Amino acid sequence: MERDAFERSLKAFTRRTPFHPFVVELVSGGQLQVYHPEALVFRNAIAVHFSQKGIPTLFDHQGVARMVETVEVSSPT
């Protein structure tokens, strides 16, 4: 992902009000689930994601394929 797009996307996703979870899809095929805006820290095209267990993952704009909103699937009634 281009550096400018990376920074714009992270800002947009983390600053939404109200916040909605989103997924960072990596070029390696991995996914980072961002459930809270404070679970992600970024500066100068480098980011650190903290999982719900507190495990940090470092990534940069070159390792990101795209970012997408998490879609909640409701159960049938």
Write out the residue ranges for each language-model feature.
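Motif-centric detector for short Cys/His coordination patterns
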Residues: M1-T77
